[in-house]
Amino acid sequence: MSDINATRLPIWGIGCDPCVGDEVTALLTRGEA
């Protein structure tokens, strides 16, 4: 289990970074504004 999780985490982070980053940026922008 740990091996699978350790392998999936980096891939998920890199693969979904753009879409997740956009959502986070939007939330941060709205919060700061």
From Swiss-Prot:
The keyword Metal-binding does not apply. The typical symptoms of amatoxin poisoning are gastro-intestinal distress beginning 6-12 hours after ingestion, a remission phase lasting 12-24 hours, and progressive loss of liver function culminating in death within 3-5 days. One of the few effective treatments is liver transplantation. Toxin belonging to the bicyclic octapeptides amatoxins that acts by binding non-competitively to RNA polymerase II and greatly slowing the elongation of transcripts from target promoters. Processed by the macrocyclase-peptidase enzyme POPB to yield a toxic cyclic decapeptide. POPB first removes 10 residues from the N-terminus. Conformational trapping of the remaining peptide forces the enzyme to release this intermediate rather than proceed to macrocyclization. The enzyme rebinds the remaining peptide in a different conformation and catalyzes macrocyclization of the N-terminal 8 residues. One of its GO terms (molecular function) is toxin activity. It holds the Pfam family Amanitin. This is Beta-amanitin proprotein. Residues 1-10, 19-33 form a propeptide. Keywords: Thioether bond, Toxin. There is a cross-link at W12-C16 (2'-cysteinyl-6'-hydroxytryptophan sulfoxide (Trp-Cys)). Belongs to the MSDIN fungal toxin family. There is a cross-link at I11-P18 (Cyclopeptide (Ile-Pro)).
